A protein has these predicted regions:
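N-terminal interaction/assembly modules
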Residues: 1-60
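Alpha-helix C-terminal capping segments
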Residues: 29-30, 69, 81-85
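Non-catalytic, well-ordered alpha-helical scaffold segments
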Residues: 48, 52, 66-67, 96
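Short amphipathic alpha helix immediately N-terminal
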Residues: 60-76
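Helix-turn-helix DNA-binding module
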Residues: 75-90
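DNA major-groove recognition helices of helix-turn-helix
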Residues: 91-109
Length: 109
């Protein structure tokens, strides 16, 4: 998607943060509802599709991209985790590439 290539890094990060939040919120709700009406079933199916889209997008990334997406958006326990691995410029380049790749796969479904 050429549109993402021209998007600011800040905007890309915001999109990823929203997706990660939605992913964890939906995972937390998984299995907690009752299937007592069709509206609830539609909501559950929508949530399961969202979870699957996130997981599929992650699996499409190469190992370095997965490392960045995982550490920056899904398991943020280690601030500055990248400092021993990359220069700041290399990290910023890889982060942008990883986010764009993830979002391209996520939005193509």
């Amino acid at each position: 998607m050429e549109r993402l290539e021209k998007t600011s890094l800040k905007s890309l990060i915001n999109q990823m943060e929203l997706i990660a939040k939605g992913y964890f919120d939906d995972r937390k709700k998984r299995g907690t509802e009752f299937l007592n009406d069709s509206d609830n079933l539609i909501y559950i199916n929508h949530r399961e599709r969202f979870i699957k889209r996130v997981e599929n997008a992650y699996l499409e990334l190469d190992p370095l991209e997965q490392l960045v997406i995982n550490n920056d958006f899904f398991y943020e326990d280690y601030p500055n985790w990248w400092t021993d691995l990359f220069s700041k410029n290399s990290y910023q380049y890889l982060k942008r590439r990883a986010i764009i790749h993830f979002l391209n796969v996520f939005y193509e479904d």
